[in-house]
Amino acid sequence: MAQILPIRFQEHLQLQNLGINPANIGFSTLTMESDKFICIREKVGEQAQVVIIDMNDPSNPIRRPISADSAIMNPASKVIALKAGKTLQIFNIEMKSKMKAHTMTDDVTFWKWISLNTVALVTDNAVYHWSMEGESQPVKMFDRHSSLAGCQIINYRTDAKQKWLLLTGISAQQNRVVGAMQLYSVDRKVSQPIEGHAASFAQFKMEGNAEESTLFCFAVRGQAGGKLHIIEVGTPPTGNQPFPKKAVDVFFPPEAQNDFPVAMQISEKHDVVFLITKYGYIHLYDLETGTCIYMNRISGETIFVTAPHEATAGIIGVNRKGQVLSVCVEEENIIPYITNVLQNPDLALRMAVRNNLAGAEELFARKFNALFAQGNYSEAAKVAANAPKGILRTPDTIRRFQSVPAQPGQTSPLLQYFGILLDQGQLNKYESLELCRPVLQQGRKQLLEKWLKEDKLECSEELGDLVKSVDPTLALSVYLRANVPNKVIQCFAETGQVQKIVLYAKKVGYTPDWIFLLRNVMRISPDQGQQFAQMLVQDEEPLADITQIVDVFMEYNLIQQCTAFLLDALKNNRPSEGPLQTRLLEMNLMHAPQVADAILGNQMFTHYDRAHIAQLCEKAGLLQRALEHFTDLYDIKRAVVHTHLLNPEWLVNYFGSLSVEDSLECLRAMLSANIRQNLQICVQVASKYHEQLSTQSLIELFESFKSFEGLFYFLGSIVNFSQDPDVHFKYIQAACKTGQIKEVERICRESNCYDPERVKNFLKEAKLTDQLPLIIVCDRFDFVHDLVLYLYRNNLQKYIEIYVQKVNPSRLPVVIGGLLDVDCSEDVIKNLILVVRGQFSTDELVAEVEKRNRLKLLLPWLEARIHEGCEEPATHNALAKIYIDSNNNPERFLRENPYYDSRVVGKYCEKRDPHLACVAYERGQCDLELINVCNENSLFKSLSRYLVRRKDPELWGSVLLESNPYRRPLIDQVVQTALSETQDPEEVSVTVKAFMTADLPNELIELLEKIVLDNSVFSEHRNLQNLLILTAIKADRTRVMEYINRLDNYDAPDIANIAISNELFEEAFAIFRKFDVNTSAVQVLIEHIGNLDRAYEFAERCNEPAVWSQLAKAQLQKGMVKEAIDSYIKADDPSSYMEVVQAANTSGNWEELVKYLQMARKKARESYVETELIFALAKTNRLAELEEFINGPNNAHIQQVGDRCYDEKMYDAAKLLYNNVSNFGRLASTLVHLGEYQAAVDGARKANSTRTWKEVCFACVDGKEFRLAQMCGLHIVVHADELEELINYYQDRGYFEELITMLEAALGLERAHMGMFTELAILYSKFKPQKMREHLELFWSRVNIPKVLRAAEQAHLWAELVFLYDKYEEYDNAIITMMNHPTDAWKEGQFKDIITKVANVELYYRAIQFYLEFKPLLLNDLLMVLSPRLDHTRAVNYFSKVKQLPLVKPYLRSVQNHNNKSVNESLNNLFITEEDYQALRTSIDAYDNFDNISLAQRLEKHELIEFRRIAAYLFKGNNRWKQSVELCKKDSLYKDAMQYASESKDTELAEELLQWFLQEEKRECFGACLFTCYDLLRPDVVLETAWRHNIMDFAMPYFIQVMKEYLTKVDKLDASESLRKEEEQATETQPIVYGQPQLMLTAGPSVAVPPQAPFGYGYTAPAYGQPQPGFGYSM
C-alpha cells in the first residue's frame, strides 16, 4: 500500500501551452498577486503586450497592447497597476478607465498589492503606500535600512492590521545568497534589520488567550545551516499570555548545498507554515509548535513567485518552466500521517482539536476512555467536547456521563460536559433533549430561554413536546426553529396568535383544514375569528370557500362580524360574488338598515340583485336607496315628489341618472304637486342639467306655470356661462318683471351675448324709471348718437351729463358731435366740456369739432389748458393747427414749443408751407418725412445741412443709395456748402465714413481734397491724410505718388504696407526712403521689386548693418553663398549661422565658412558654431589648427564632429577627435580603418563595448589577426544575443578551427552561458564529432538540448542523440533511435532504464519485436522490466502468433499473479505440452481466469490419468457433478468420486454412486461412501439397498449413527413440548384486568380544556390530533 501523504499536490496549468514565451516566465516579467490572476509582460513582434490569465478561465487569456516596465493585477478585481519609468497608473480593465496616476521622484524598484486597495512602492531609499481610493498620493512609510543597500528586493509583507511592515531582499556574498530583512513598526516608528530569506505574518489564537497574537515567521539559510523562527511581535494584548518563541532547524539535503528559502505562506485555516526553497523543496511546519510535518521536492525548477491559494488554504506558485502548481494540506490524511508516520500523537491531537481535522478518532477515543476509567470526568468531558468532527458527541457518551453519580457539593460530570459544549457552540438534537429534561424538571425555564436566544440548542419536535408541558409559547419557538408546521399552528391557535397562522402556513407550504380551524377559533373569540377569516381570503385565491366562512359566522349569529368580514372579502367587487353581495345587503336591511344604507352609499358593490334590494329598501324606509334602484317611471314619480324626505343634493344628482323625457316628466310632476315646496329643487335640477334637458324646454316649462321667479333664478344660474342670446334676453326680461334693476344693469354691462338692438328697443319700450341700463347698452354697442337723440328729445338732459360724467367720460367727443348735430347751444357744449375736464381723448374731440368746421370753438379751452401747464401733445397739436391756419407767428411756435407731435403738425404743413414742415420734421428728427419734403421741393441745401448735423450713418446710407435720383445734387451741396460750414470734427468724420460705406471713392476724393488740400481747419488731420492716400490707392493710383510727396502727416509704415499689398512697390519704397526706414526700403527692393543690384547699391549708400543683414539673407536664399558670407561679415551678424553652415556644406565653400565661423565665435561662443568650425577645419585639412583648437577651451560637440569625420572617411581627423574625448570605442573603429590592429584592440578594451569588440574582432578576422580576434571574441561570446552573428562571421569565411579554439577558451569564463556550450556542441557535431560525447557528458545540463538534438541528428551521431534524448526526457525518441540504429546506439542497461519511462506504450511492443529479432536471449529480462505497463493479453497474442511462447515462459510465470486469461491459458497449454500436471494443478487452483470447460473437455481425453483427474476436478468446479463423477468412475478414482458426490449435495447422484459400487461389488467403497455422503442419503433407501444385497454388516455403522441422531432429536422435542405446556398453564391462571389507564396520544393537548362539542378541541381535531401522514413522523 502506498504511503499516505499529508499534502495534496496539483498542477493547474502550463503557461507555455497558453502561448506564453518561456523567456518571459521569470521574476522580472511575470507577477502573481493572488490566486485569481497571473500577469505576464511579452513582446510580440515589435508590440509590447500584457497577458492577463484569469485562473477561473485560463483558456481565454486577455492580451492588451500595453508598454510598461512592470504590471501587477489587483488581488481580487480586474484592476491593473502599470509602471513605466517613474510614472505609475491604475486602470480598471472592465470599465476601460484610468482610476489614478502619479509620477514618482525616484525609480520604483519593487511594488506589490498589500491589500485590495493599497499598493506598496519600494524605491532605493524608502517605502511608500499608495491607496487606490480618492485622490491621495503615495504616503511614505519608512526609510530603507542600510543593510538592504545593493540587495535585490524580492518581497514585501504586512500583518493583517498593517501595523508591522517587512521588506525582504537578497544579495550574493562569499559564494552564497544572503537574505536581508527590515522589520518596521508603524506605531513605534522604528526598524530592525534581520538576516532572513523568506517571511510572513500570521494571526494565531493560543489556547486560553482571549485575543489573537500577531506572529512573525521567518526562515534563513546561514553559514551554520537553516533555521525557522516563529516569534510574537509587539506587546501581547491585555490578558494574553505571550507566545513562546520557536526556533527550529530547516533541513537541506546534502545535494542542495546552495539551496535557500525563497517563499513562505501561512495557512490561516490549518495554522501550517508552507516554506518553499530555490531548488523546489516544500517544507510544512506546525505554526504553534514549529514541528516539521513534511518535506519533499515538488518542482525541478525554481518556483519564483507564490501566493496564498484561497480555495484550499494552501500555497500556489509558478516555476521557471511555466507550471502553475499548488500544495495544500490533505485534511483526510494529515492527522493519520502525523500519528503513524511521524509517531507524534500529541501533535496529532493538538492539530485535530485546533483545526477540527479528522483522523485522530482512535486517539481521542483511547484518551477519553482512559480518563473516564481514571475517574477524571472533567478532563474526559473536555476531550469528548473538543474531539474534532464531533466524533465523541454521541448518545453513548451522554449515557456514560449519566451513569456516573454526582458527588455531594460538586457539579455532576454530565452538567460539566454540557457546560463545555455550551461554551463551544451548539448542542445536537440528542444533547439538547438530555440537557433540557433535567433543567425543566428543576423549573429553570429561564436557562432554556437563554440558550435558545444564544442558539445553543438544536431544536426538534421532541424538544418542543418536552417544553410544551411547561410553556406553550416557548414550545412554539422550538417548533418554529425545528420546522414542525402542525405543531406550530396548534401552538399559534392555543396562544391566540391567529394572525400568524396563515403567514406561517404559506411560508412553510403547509395546508391545514381551514374551516375546521376557523370554527374552533370562532368559539373562543369571535373577534379573533373575524380576523382569522379575513386572513383566509386576503389573497387573490382564497384559502377557504367564502360561502362556508359566512355559514360559520351565521351559525353563531355574528351579523356584525360577518358584515365586517364580507366588506373586506368582497372589496374587489367581482361578478362571481353577486349572491354574496345580495346576502350581505339583505341581512343588514333586515337587521341593521343604517349599516345597509352606509354600504349602499359607499357604492362598493354592483353585482347584487338590484330589484330585490330596491323593494327591501322601500320597506325599510330608505326612500333614497329605493329611488337609486328603481327603474320604472311610475315608481320613480311616486317617490320623487316627496322631496321633504329626500336629501336635496342627492336628489339633484339623481336626476342625472334619468333620461331627458323622464326628467322633464318628474319636474312637471313636482311643480304640479307643490310648486311652492318644490320650486327650489326644480330650479337646482334645471340649472344643473339644462344642457341635457335643453334650456328652451326648461324656459317653456317655467313659463307654462307663469313662474317668472323660477325663470329668473334658473336663468340667473346659467346666464353667466351661457352663450345663447335668447337666454340673456329672457333673463333681462325676467329681471325687469321681478324688479331686479341692479341685475339688469349688471347683465347689460357684463354680457356679450345678447342682441344689443333687441335689448335697446326693449329698454326703450319698457320705460324704466332708471335709464342707466339703456345708457350702458348704448355706450357698449356704440349707440351713443341714438342715445343722445333719445335723451335730448325726451328732455332727459340730466342723463346726458350723468353719462359723460359717471358712466363713460371718454365718450364726450361723440356726445359733443351729437349735440352739435342737434344744434345745441355753444354755451351748453362749452360747459359740458369744462365739467368733464380732460377724461377724454383731446384728439377725438378736436377731430369731431374739426369735421364740423367749429375748431375755433376750442381755442379758449385749449389756451386755458396750456396756461394750466398741460403738456398733452394733442392739445398743442390743435393749438399749432389754429396758429398755422391763422398765420399767427407759426414758425416761432414750431421752433420753441416742445410738446406738439412733429409728424402730425409736419404733415398738416406739407401742402400749406413746406418750409414749416421742414422745421417741424427737423425738430422731431422725422428723417424720412423731411427727406421726402426736401426731395419733392428741391430743398437740397437744407437737407445736406440736416444730414451733416444729424450724424446718422444709417440715414446717410439711405440717401447715398445708387437708386436715389437726388443723390448727385445732394452730394454737390454737401461738398460745396454743408462741410465747408462745419467746424465739428465728428460731423466731418461721420460724413466721410458714410461716403466710404456707400463705396463712392471718387466723390470721397473730391470731398477730402476740399477738406485737406484747401487749407481748411482739417488740413493737417492725420486720419484724413491717410484716408485720402488710401482712397487714391483704391480708386485712382495715378494720384498716389503726388499725395505721398505733398502730404507729410500720414502713417508712413502702414500706408507703405498697404501700398505693397496693392503692388505699388515703388510708392512704398518712396515712403520708406522719405521717412528713412532703410531696412524696410531694402526689403521692398529685395522681396517685391526683386533687384539685388539696386539693393546692393542702396546698402552701400546707407551702410547700415541691418541693411547688410537683410541683403545677406536674400543672397543666401538665392544661392550666392560667397557674396552672402561677405555681406554677413560686413553686417557683423552671426545670427544666421545655422543657415550659413548648411549652405556652405551644400556648396562646399569651406574656406569662406571658416572665416565666417571665426567672426561668429567672437560674437557668441555657441556650441554649434564651434562644432562646425572644427568640422570646417577638418574639411580644409588644417589638422594642426584643429588640434590646437580642441586642446583649448571650447564648447564644441567633439564626439559629433568625430562621427561626421568618421562617416566621411576622414580617419586622421577622427582619430584626433576621438582621442580628445576618450571615445575608445569609436577610436578603435578608426584605428581599424587605419590598419593599427593592436592599438584598436587596446582601444576596444578601454571602451569595453560589445559593438566595439565586434567591429574590431571582425576587422582582425578579415586581417587574419586571429590571436587579436580571439581576444576580442572572448568579450563578445558572453553576450548570448551576439554569439550567433560572431559564429556566422567565422563560419562564412571558413575559420572553423579558430572558432572552436575561441569557444573552448571561452568555456572557462565566469559569464559562460548556455549558448556558448550549445554552439560548441553543434560545431563539434559538424567538425570534430569525436569530441562531442565528452563535451555532452560534461556539460549536458548547460546546453540547449533541442538545438543540439537537431545537430546530432543531422550529423548521424546516434549514441550522442540517445544520450541527449535521455537527458531531455524525450524517452520515446531515445528508444526509437536505439532500435533504428542498434549498432551505434543500443546499450542493454540504458535501453531497459529508458524504456520504462516512455509515454507511448506502443513502443513496448516495438521493443519486444526488436529484442525478438536482435536479442532473443535477453527478451525475458526486457519483459520483466516492461510488465508493470504491458498489456499482457496483447503480448501473449503476439508471442502466440510468432510461436515463441516457450521462449517467454519465465515472463508468463512472473505475471500470472495478474490472473490474466490469456496468460493463464498460455501457461496451461505449455504445462500440458510439457506434461507437467503438478504445475497445471497449481496454476488452475491459484488462477481461475481461463475457459474451464474447454480445458476440462480437452483433458478428459488426455492419455495421462493425472490430466484426466484434473479434468474431473474442473468439471466439479463448474457444477458438472455427474460428468465429474462419471469420469472418476471410468478411471477408478473412487475417493474422488465419493468426495465430488458429497460436495454436489445431490441425493440422487449419491444414491446412483452407491448403486454403482454395488454393481462393481466394491463393498468397502459402499461403506466408505455411506459416511462420505452421510447427509445426502436417505436411511430407508440405504436400509433397503443393504438388505437386498445382503451387506447389512457394511451398513450397520451407518444405521447406528442414524439411530443416535434420531433419538437425540426426539428427546429435545419432548422437553420443548413440556416447557410450552407449563408456560400456557401459568398464563391462564392470571386474572383479566379491565380499566387499565390508556395512553393518551402524544400530540394531545396539555392544557386543561372545558367540555366541548364532539368536534371541538378533542383528539379528533386534525389540527391538534395525531400527526397525519405527510406532517408527522411517518414521512
UniProtKB/Swiss-Prot annotation:
Q: Which residues carry this modification: Phosphoserine?
A: S67, S1167, S1229, S1494
Q: Where is this region: WD40-like repeat 7?
A: 302-330
Q: Where is this region: WD40-like repeat 3?
A: 108-149
Sites where N-acetylalanine occurs are at: A2
- Topology of this chain in the membrane: Peripheral membrane protein
Q: Annotated region WD40-like repeat 5: where?
A: 196-257
Q: Where is this region: WD40-like repeat 4?
A: 150-195
- Modification Phosphotyrosine, positions: Y184, Y634, Y899, Y1206, Y1477, Y1487
Which residues does the annotated region (Flexible linker) include?
Answer: 480-523
Which compartments does it reside in?
A: Cytoplasmic vesicle membrane; Membrane, Coated pit; Melanosome; Cytoplasm, Cytoskeleton, Spindle
In alphabetical order, the GO MF annotations are: arrestin family protein binding; clathrin light chain binding; disordered domain specific binding; identical protein binding; protein domain specific binding; structural molecule activity
The record, for SUPFAM superfamilies, names:
ARM repeat, Clathrin heavy-chain terminal domain
* Chain positions covered by the region annotation WD40-like repeat 2: 68-107
The record comments on the domains as follows: The C-terminal third of the heavy chains forms the hub of the triskelion. This region contains the trimerization domain and the light-chain binding domain involved in the assembly of the clathrin lattice.
Q: What is this protein called?
A: Clathrin heavy chain 1
The encoding gene = CLTC
